[in-house]
Amino acid sequence: MLDAYLVPDKTTVTAKGDGPLLDLGALESRVLLLELKISGAVEQESIEVSILGGADEPGIGKLPLASFPQLFYRGDYPLLLDLTAVPQARVLRAHWEVNRWGRGSQAPWFEFGVRATEVSPQLLKEREAGTRRA
């Protein structure tokens, strides 16, 4: 079961950038729970985090497989990424854009991390069975 960071926890950024490459290996379910944790931020700024994927590093596309909404505050933000329709995706990488406006320094500052955890096939089966009964 995959449990890894697309962006290491408490990474500090002041400009747009990319996280390290994450090799997906042999996923059982091809469904990931992505957790964006913003542990530090200043006022009047935003961050947008998207997840890019492909067969290998040169094959990572420009269009995201998933994107968190534009965020402004500290907190934990979950997002499910279903890769069943993208069988060629073997590696993932996080990309972020930051922006700051208003008074004071115009340099944005965020401290955050993005964790990817594989959702177990058993849990997916249980949820699917529960949905059919409802």
Question: Predicted segment positions?
Answer:
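Contiguous beta-strand segments within globular domains
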Residues: 15-36
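Local beta-strand/beta-hairpin segments that build beta-sheet-rich folds
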Residues: 1-14, 21-24, 62-69
